[in-house]
C-alpha cells in the first residue's frame, strides 16, 4: 500500500509527528497510516523513537508538532459520554476524531498491551477482565457476557479463577491481550507482545493475533523480533534516531534494499576472507565477530570457491531476510537503552 493510499483508507493517521525533550529531538516528522485489518510494525534499535511514537498515539505524550486522527469504521461497544452503547458514529466521528481534544472517544476504540504486564495481582483472570471493562463505562452485565468468550480466545477458560501469579508468562501475556479486547477495540497497540515467551507461547500468541487481523481488527506493533514482524506485519515502519528511514511491505523492503542471497561463513580464520579475492564475488560483505556475511545476486560461484579453497570453514546459504535489512539500515553496533 502506498503512503497516499494508506492515508485515504486509514483507520488511524499520524502526520508529521515530532517530539523534543530539551535540545534532543526524539521523533522528527514521522507520518504513517493504518488501514482496517492491517498490522503495521514499527521497528528500530534502542533509542529510535518507537516508544515515544506509541505514547503519542495513545495520547500519553503530547507531540510538539503534527496531528493524530482516528476514523471509526463502526460504533464501539463502549458508551460515549452522554450516549448509549453501540450508537451510530456522529458526524464528527465520520470526519475524524483528533487527539488531544477527542482523547476519550479515541481511547474507547483502542486496546493496549504494554511490554510489561499491568495485571492486578489480587484479582482472578475473570475479575481482571471485569474491572478493566468498568474503566470504559461498560455495564457489568455486558462485561460478564464477554468474559467467557475472551477467556476462550486466550485459551484460559480453565484459569478463570486463577490469579496472575499462578499463570505462566505466556498465559499472562494472553490474559493481557484478552483484557485489551474487553471494549471490542478497532485498533490494538502492542508493545513487544512476545518478549520473554518461549517458542510455543510465541506461536500461540501469533495465532491469536492473526485471528484478530482476519476479523478486521487493526494492529500497531513494536517488536525486536524480525521473524515476528515478517509473520504478522503487512507493512513496516523503520525508525532510527527519531526519523522514518523506510516504509513498505517486508518483502518489498527486502527486495529494494538487499541482495537476494546471503552466505554466512564462520570458523577459525573466517575473518581473513574479508580481504581475500572472494570479496569480488559479493556485492558487499560485513564482518561481525567471527562471522563474515557475503551478500550476492548469485551465490553459486562463491559457494564453489569456498568449498574448494576453504573446506574447513562452515557456511550457511540462505535468502536475505528482515534481520539483514534491519542491520543494514541501523548498523550492527549495540545501542544501550538511555
Predicted region positions:
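Helix-to-loop junction immediately C-terminal to a conserved catalytic motif
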Residues: 58
